[in-house]
Amino acid sequence: MKRVVAALILKDDLILACQRTRHQVMPLKWEFPGGKIEEGEQPRDAMRRELEEELGIVAEVGAEVARIIHEYPGGGSVELRFFEIHKYQGEIENRIFREIRWVTRKELLGLDFLEADLGLVNDLAAGKIL
């Protein structure tokens, strides 16, 4: 099973959403920044590393707010661990995505998110978490 971390970066009641490029797996889908946990790496360390690589920030990783195991149709599974990020150093810069966007909870529903993220997106929009 693939193990992944993702960040819920919050600023002024907005959440950062990121769109994959057309050259990535599941092109042009929206997601939260993050990535694969490497062998022997702790989830919080992976979260800090991914945010530095993808957005150029040094993040203070907050609480783990959700853990989802998703089975993809046709095979393959992923464990996603979502962490809240309220504080970070540096200015966010888009290093790998087609687009990054600060959105309200309700605006999340209008973006074409990865299937594995949909339950969390619905919970965020409904105010059930964070």
Model-derived regions: residue spans:
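Conserved N-terminal beta-strand and adjoining loop/helix that marks the start
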Residues: 1-16, 36
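Conserved hydrophobic "DFG−1" position in protein kinase catalytic cores
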Residues: 9-10, 17, 87, 102
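Conserved Nudix-box catalytic region and its N-terminal flanking loop in Nudix hydrolases
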Residues: 14-53
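Active-site-adjacent beta-strand/loop module that shapes the phosphate/pyrophosphate-binding cleft
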Residues: 58-59, 68-91, 101-105
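NUDIX/MutT-family hydrolases
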Residues: 82-84, 93-124
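Generic C-terminal helix-cap and adjacent flexible tail
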Residues: 125-130
